């Protein structure tokens, strides 16, 4: 009888595993923060849901929405602003990505830092771009999301790289460490980078040279939100040397996106597993320290997946 029960149990277990739903999760580059985060969260989900199997694969912020749309992946890491562009066929996306939906955002924040040296003439980016001449700016590499936001800012102020060049500006692009070196060595007066807070490159800049992180004008932020789904964020006073007041600026939030083809039940279980294990997220990656399911859909720039919405409604996080 025991042998029979064991055989039956084995058959049932095999049947259960065979019927498990396999989901591909597109992360970031191997060895990067997104890959580490994805692998860790996937482990939490599968440990609590034996009927879900997750395969984590490399991906990227701009590529992941298209992988979801084409059903190459069913879950992916993303940036809230980039996801908004994909869903609304803006920027680099020529077609609406109508299969892209949100599970939650705020996993980690990427805050825009517009840094000025203490002796720089202009105290805000509006005056710099509309009145400035012969100024020097260092920005992250062309094609980066940092540089993309700078292009949006230039567009708002009716200027461009070509126009700045005519006015004697020198704009240099490079890695975060190269931008920091340019600022520290006095080769530029302003630096534009998008980093988690506190950003190592900005710490380096402001420990070596007096300066501050500036606030973006409210009208600019309103336009960026309306046209590009770009949200605001705050760098608290005393975050950096010389930072004697809060700086309100732009924020791209790391989001977890999912295909609308995934069932309500599956995404509900995924959301539930994440939210009931929030206390484990920081140990996976320190940038997830402040993530909260209570605020995971605040300022959502794309539709929330019905499965995630079902869980959030049950918990009273959304109406």
Residue ranges and their predicted role:
Residues 22-48, 52-55, 111-185, 294, ...:
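Bilobed "Venus flytrap"/periplasmic-binding protein-like clamshell domains
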